[in-house]
């Protein structure tokens, strides 16, 4: 009886208020048994059984780092009954590099990251709650000081709403550092910055000053502080934190794999 009443109510609401129910496409089922990596002309491609992987635009999927290719093949192999692309961050980043859906050039990405620095999350500290401000100063300021020393800049935190002003040379120094990376690695930078809302924390991760777990904790500092007062829904907040850690870890690995000439050495039988 309850099911019938629910159906009637849904039908009446939909017809009266013209409510449209959004239907999301179902995840495709896994259609392959095993994954592999093949190499050709210094490029590495991913195979699903005997078929080579393609990008969303239908272009041949390839990377120039063997460790990255193995990691991507592992992502596909980790899919069970269905293929959940939303959790395959290395695959998504590599496809973005190949397809370049937004037609971004290297200078576009560098400018985006440099401009983001002026609105970096950890430069804006609380002006209302003293305990929160003290926590931010204790946890965020050491990373800001490291960033200033590492890149020869002078960024200062603020507890107001005004955008911090940069000293002469700041933009040039940060741009020079970011421009030393190729376009693929910069896509990883951009993904990490969008995850953390912080260029400073991203650079600290890439340079191994802090771990991805620590970076996520610092990015969520105010949220964690509020949860300490109001309580938390364990599974919901834990899932959110772990999702950020997965996204950030994938981004940092993507930067590493596209910034080094690392290859996997296979054992040779004698």
Residue ranges and their predicted role:
Residues 166-235:
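An internal, amphipathic alpha-helical element
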Residues 59-63, 121-124, 131, 201:
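Short cationic amphipathic helices and targeting signals
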Residues 107-174:
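Internal, conserved structured core segments that host functional sites
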Residues 15-104:
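An N-terminal structural lobe/cap that precedes and organizes the functional/catalytic core
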Residues 154, 212-216, 223-224, 230-270:
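Mature, matrix/stroma-exposed regions of nuclear-encoded mitochondrial and chloroplast proteins
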Residues 1-27, 270:
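N-terminal mitochondrial targeting presequence
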């Amino acid at each position: 009886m309850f099911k019938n009443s629910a159906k009637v109510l849904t039908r009446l609401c939909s017809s009266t208020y013209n409510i449209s129910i959004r239907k999301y496409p179902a995840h495709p089922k896994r259609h392959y048994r095993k994954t592999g990596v093949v190499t050709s002309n210094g490029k590495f491609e991913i195979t699903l059984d005997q078929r080579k992987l393609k990008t969303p635009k239908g272009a041949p999927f390839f990377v120039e780092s063997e460790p990255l290719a193995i990691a991507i093949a592992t992502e596909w192999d980790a899919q069970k009954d269905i293929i959940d692309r939303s959790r395959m961050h290395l695959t998504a980043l590599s496809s973005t590099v190949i397809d370049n859906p937004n037609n971004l050039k290297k200078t576009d990405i560098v400018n985006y990251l440099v401009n983001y620095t002026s609105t970096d999350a950890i430069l804006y500290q609380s002006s209302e709650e003293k305990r929160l401000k003290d926590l931010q100063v204790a946890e965020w300021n050491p990373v800001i000081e490291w960033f200033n020393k590492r890149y020869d800049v002078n960024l200062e935190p603020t507890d107001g709403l005004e955008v911090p002003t940069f000293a002469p040379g700041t933009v040039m120094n940060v741009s020079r550092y970011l421009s030393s990376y190729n376009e693929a690695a910069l896509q990883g930078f951009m993904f990490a910055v969008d995850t953390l809302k912080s260029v400073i924390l991203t650079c600290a991760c890439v340079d191994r000053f802090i771990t991805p777990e620590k970076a996520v904790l610092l990015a969520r500092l105010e949220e964690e502080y509020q949860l300490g007062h109001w309580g938390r829904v364990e599974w919901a907040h834990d899932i959110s934190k772990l999702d950020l850690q997965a996204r950030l870890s994938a981004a940092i690995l993507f930067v590493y794999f596209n910034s080094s000439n690392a290859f996997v050495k296979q054992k040779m039988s004698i």
